[in-house]
């Protein structure tokens, strides 16, 4: 087993501002520019596949596949994974063709395809669950966030969708571009890069944040906050991040795309059975957080976090790796996004047919084949390709 990490020169920490995705300056990613990118891919079919990721445990499958040599085993040339600091910088690089495969917030994937008309496809779920609402030590209930600001990683994120469901369930109103009011029972939403959230909580700038791990585990380890609710306890086994590939990769390098998916699915199967070992790999040059914090995030138990769970049988505390992309989730997510407040272009949601979105945006061909190669759906604790969504704020 290899323990290679990306070289220092490949770590791109771009963009220090908010994680809001506005779509400005993204013309290079529109479908009419696809021919230029296609020509580039066709001219250099052996160019290494370039991977982009954020320093969060959500990226585990992409990174485990690299560390364990699974891409090599699948005969797929890959460059060292490139670390980005914010979702906006990662998304912009992907749309502009600077990286070929990434993990991405699923609502952002919808915006990328329908808002920006980018030539991209969801090819698998990258993971399920893995996020939480973390608050200051003095915050006991969601209602206590009245008059506070809460950080979100991006407007188009499952985090924002689920947070707003929690706020409304507690009788609070999310607001943007205005100061929150305790008497008015409002909460200000503040887009922020995940790496900035813990310092902001510690300095009293925000009352809480909703984000992927290991930033929730880090807050508890440093005793500056506590996990109030795991998002997987609100929306059971939801897809936070999906695996996305550029259309150029799928069209002009189908063997590389298929091999890449084989490696990714193999990594998911390995990671869900080897959590401490996964933490060790991630801490060896891929993520900046220390191994104990990463391992804590990968090994949460319902017994230790009972106060953050209302449905312990859902195991919403558990970051899991289940690659099959369920149509029911896509459809419910589209409907939820249409009810979510954002300070970003939202016209692309008007008139979207949830079922059609899944057929147009998600291509499960490769992942279905790859799942069979590692033992089928049962290898991931799954029993079928349909399910019913369960949401309880």
Predicted regions and their residues:
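Secondary-structure end/capping motifs
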Residues: 253-347
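Short, cationic motifs built from Arg/Lys/His that form the positively charged side of catalytic pockets
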Residues: 8-9, 164
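Short Gly/Pro-enriched turn/cap motifs at secondary-structure boundaries
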Residues: 53, 124, 232-234, 302-303, ...
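N-terminal export signals
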Residues: 4, 10-32
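Short, glycine-/small- and polar/acidic-enriched structural segments
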Residues: 22-25, 29-191, 202-203, 207-213, ...
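Pocket-lining segment of extracytoplasmic ligand-binding domains
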Residues: 106-108, 183, 195-293
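Predominant activation on well-ordered alpha-helical scaffold segments within soluble catalytic domains
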Residues: 110, 164, 168, 217, ...
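Conserved C-terminal helix/tail region of periplasmic/extracytoplasmic solute-binding proteins
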Residues: 331-393
């Amino acid at each position: 087993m290899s323990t290679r990490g990306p070289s220092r020169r490949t770590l791109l920490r771009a963009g220090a501002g908010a994680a809001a995705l506005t779509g400005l300056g993204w013309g290079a990613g529109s479908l009419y520019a696809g021919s230029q990118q296609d020509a580039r891919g066709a001219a250099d079919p052996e160019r290494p596949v370039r991977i982009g990721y954020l320093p969060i445990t959500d990226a585990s499958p992409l990174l485990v596949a690299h560390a364990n040599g699974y891409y090599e085993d699948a005969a797929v040339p890959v460059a060292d994974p490139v670390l980005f600091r914010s979702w906006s910088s990662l998304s912009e690089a992907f749309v502009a063709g600077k990286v070929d495969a990434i993990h991405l917030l699923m609502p952002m994937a919808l915006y990328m395809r329908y808002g920006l008309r980018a030539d991209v496809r969801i090819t698998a779920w990258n993971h399920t669950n893995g996020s939480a609402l973390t608050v200051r030590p003095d915050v006991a209930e969601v209602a206590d966030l009245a008059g506070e600001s809460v950080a979100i990683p991006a407007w188009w994120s499952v985090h924002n969708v689920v947070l707003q469901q929690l706020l409304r369930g507690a009788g609070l109103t999310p607001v943007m571009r205005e100061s929150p009011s305790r008497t008015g029972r409002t909460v200000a939403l503040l887009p922020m890069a995940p790496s900035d959230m813990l310092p902001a909580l510690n300095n009293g700038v925000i009352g809480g944040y909703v984000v992927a791990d290991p930033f929730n585990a880090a807050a508890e380890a440093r005793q500056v906050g506590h996990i109030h609710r795991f998002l997987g306890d609100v929306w059971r086994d939801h897809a936070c991040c999906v695996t996305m590939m550029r259309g150029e990769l799928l069209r002009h390098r189908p063997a590389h795309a298929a091999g890449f998916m084989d490696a990714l699915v193999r990594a998911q199967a390995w990671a869900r059975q080897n959590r401490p070992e996964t933490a060790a790999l991630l801490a060896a040059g891929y993520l900046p957080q220390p191994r104990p914090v990463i391992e804590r995030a990968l090994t949460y138990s319902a017994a230790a976090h009972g106060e953050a769970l209302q449905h312990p049988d859902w195991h919403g505390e558990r970051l899991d790796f289940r690659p099959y992309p369920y149509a029911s989730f896509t459809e419910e997510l589209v409907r939820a996004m249409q009810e979510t407040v954002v300070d970003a272009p939202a016209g692309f949601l008007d008139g979207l047919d949830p079922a059609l979105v899944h057929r147009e945006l998600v291509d499960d061909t490769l992942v279905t084949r790859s799942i069979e190669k590692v033992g089928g759906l049962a290898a991931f604790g799954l029993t079928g390709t349909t399910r019913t969504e369960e949401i309880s704020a």
